[in-house]
């Protein structure tokens, strides 16, 4: 392994011999030692922590260390880890069989729960957010008879070929321009524009409107760090798309059922045509969905000509975990998530300000990021201009003090309803030293 993190007081990654041994073993048999790139710690240096269990707000690694979890499996774990209701739902479902390749009552119940919460008339269950957005794009093309798609730089919609152009998430984390293996033909129908720039959208529609099938946007960007839409951006996107005969696809894989009972739509509604969901709706298991008006969804096979399928779609275990989670996700739970996120954000901001570290706290509901910059952040270019070395120092100081943050400056922080006073006290205790570490690096860095 190559340690790319600079040595220095309070900044060097703590030794983690059990995780190091597991990572060495994994690197021999798994590309990069991980099954999703951001987990490898390449953006922050050091060895990824191998997690052996979670309970409530806590993660426990292979070396026996305990961390307050501010990643929450990248969003899904709104109840915390191993919630008794979810564990019991999984135990009961598994006892009846794990997969049948046939319809089940559970998938009907989960679909009904989504339709009750979200602005969709019909929904199709799939296994991942990538499948959901990929299928929504195919459906939009089939419905409109058009080919071209508008997306926004820094917005991540999964790793399907057509949507990896100028993507956020791991692509931003690793500093990749785009992905080799994506052919010009696959990406050729994708138009990439700056986020929050309606004038750019209007200009493209003026030039190429009859070719554009859909605009796809994250409901609030969460994969370049958290950047909320400005000036009614989503509503204005819908108006421009509809005026030109195109659809608007809103990707709520991250925000859906996390920031409110109805997802981002509950905070900032817009007249989108198709919506995608994931993460929370699976309760920590692989599950996602896309949905919209019945008129559009009826174009899907077996009733329509647009083909989409999946062996494990609507898996009974995933449906059981998702239902157990959503049935506990009431307004009181969302108030708790909002309050907890506000406290954590305030504590982080106060510590960084006291240490003299330039920063911007950017939020979308209870999702938030800390950008290490004093400039306004409103799109991918401004998000990318932050002081990444300062984040690295901050990350490792927090990790050493028992707080697990996303190992990337370009990801959202997430809270769970399980975060209690003890967890908040641990976060508060960790922040001053982490802010000091960031200040030390920031003072001698020109950015990255």
Swiss-Prot record:
The modification N6-(pyridoxal phosphate)lysine is found at residue 279. It comes from the Bacteria. Its cofactor is pyridoxal 5'-phosphate. It is found in: Cytoplasm. It catalyses: (S)-4-amino-5-oxopentanoate = 5-aminolevulinate. Keywords: Cytoplasm, Isomerase, Porphyrin biosynthesis, Pyridoxal phosphate. It holds the Pfam family Aminotran_3. One of its GO terms (molecular function) is glutamate-1-semialdehyde 2,1-aminomutase activity. One of its GO terms (cellular component) is cytoplasm. Its main location: cytoplasm. Its EC number is 5.4.3.8. GO terms for biological process: protoporphyrinogen IX biosynthetic process. Coiled coil: none annotated. Pathway: Porphyrin-containing compound metabolism; protoporphyrin-IX biosynthesis; 5-aminolevulinate from L-glutamyl-tRNA(Glu): step 2/2. PANTHER family: GLUTAMATE-1-SEMIALDEHYDE 2,1-AMINOMUTASE, GLUTAMATE-1-SEMIALDEHYDE 2,1-AMINOMUTASE 1, CHLOROPLASTIC-RELATED. Belongs to the class-III pyridoxal-phosphate-dependent aminotransferase family. HemL subfamily. Homodimer. This is Glutamate-1-semialdehyde 2,1-aminomutase.
């Amino acid at each position: 392994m190559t340690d790319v993190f600079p040595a220095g007081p309070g900044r060097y990654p703590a030794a983690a011999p059990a995780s190091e041994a597991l990572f060495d073993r994994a690197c021999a048999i798994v590309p990069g030692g991980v099954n999703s790139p951001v987990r490898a710690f390449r953006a922050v240096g050091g060895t990824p922590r191998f997690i052996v269990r979670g309970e409530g707000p806590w993660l426990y690694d292979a070396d026996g260390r305990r961390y307050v979890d501010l990643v929450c499996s990248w969003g899904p774990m709104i109840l915390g880890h191993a919630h008794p209701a979810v564990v019991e739902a999984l135990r009961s479902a598994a006892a009846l069989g794990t997969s049948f390749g046939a319809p089940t009552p559970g998938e009907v119940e989960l679909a009904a729960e989504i339709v009750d919460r979200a602005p969709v008339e019909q929904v199709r269950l799939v296994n991942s957010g990538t499948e959901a957005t990929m299928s929504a794009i195919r459906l939009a093309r089939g419905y409109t008879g058009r080919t071209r798609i508008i997306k926004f730089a820094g917005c991540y919609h999964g790793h399907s070929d057509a949507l990896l152009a100028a993507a956020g998430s791991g692509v931003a984390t690793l500093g990749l321009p785009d992905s080799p293996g994506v052919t010009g033909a696959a990406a050729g129908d994708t138009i990439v524009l700056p986020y929050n720039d309606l004038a750019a959208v209007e200009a493209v529609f003026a030039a190429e409107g009859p070719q554009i099938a859909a605009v796809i946007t994250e409901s609030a960007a969460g994969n370049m760090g958290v950047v909320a839409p400005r000036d009614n951006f989503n509503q204005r996107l819908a108006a421009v798309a509809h005026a030109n005969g195109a659809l608007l696809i809103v990707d709520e894989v991250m925000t859906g059922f996390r920031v409110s009972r109805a997802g981002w739509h509950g905070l900032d509604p817009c007249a989108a045509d198709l919506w995608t969901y994931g993460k929370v709706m699976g309760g920590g298991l692989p599950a996602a969905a896309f949905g919209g008006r019945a008129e559009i969804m009826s174009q899907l096979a077996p009733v329509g000509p647009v083909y989409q399928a999946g062996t494990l779609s609507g898996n009974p275990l995933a449906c059981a975990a998702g239902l157990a989670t959503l049935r506990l996700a009431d307004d009181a739970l969302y108030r708790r998530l909002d309050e907890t996120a506000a406290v954590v954000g305030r504590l982080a901001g106060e510590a960084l300000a006291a240490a003299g570290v330039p920063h911007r706290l950017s939020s979308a509901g209870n999702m938030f990021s800390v950008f290490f910059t004093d400039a306004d952040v409103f799109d991918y270019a401004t998000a990318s201009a932050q002081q990444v070395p300062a984040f690295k120092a901050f990350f490792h100081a927090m990790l050493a003090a028992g707080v697990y943050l996303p190992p990337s400056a370009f990801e959202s922080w997430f809270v769970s309803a399980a975060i209690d006073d003890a967890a908040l006290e641990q976060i508060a205790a960790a922040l001053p030293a982490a802010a000091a570490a960031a200040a030390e690096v920031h003072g001698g860095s020109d950015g990255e």
